[in-house]
Amino acid sequence: MDKLRKKKKLILVAGSIERSKNILSQIDDITDKKLLNFDRVKAGFIYMIRGFFLKIVIADRIAVIADEVFNRYYSYGTFVLILGAVCFAFQIYCDFASYSTIAIGSAQIMGFTLMENFETPYFAMSIKEFWRRWHISLSMWFRDYLYIPLGGTRKA
């Protein structure tokens, strides 16, 4: 385990932006767990299937509509343009949420717990609440590494 702790090249390129202390603290726990725990693997695969469904079935299908509208915007009326914009908004959400969900599931199979990254942002009642629910780990990163060091308060 000390070899794993010394290697600082553990990078997750999709999903939540996790704090290193959260991941490192879980490395010690992995040695206490069975290498393959059926319930953990099953839960991880369910997360991954949900993520693949969001990406392949929803996001990619909605992208066809959004792309068509944006590629030929000049030949459509207001209603279709609004529909294209709504489709694009859901495509973006489903793309981001699917990558995060797949990453959470694959990490869970390996014994790691990652934070949820989206909390139904399109049901927010304000822009502030939307941003709090959208890409949560990115917002926390901006808060902890930019906003607070530049003089912001922790209560904001």
Outline where the language-model segments fall.
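Membrane-embedded transmembrane alpha-helical bundles that form the catalytic cores
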Residues: 1-156
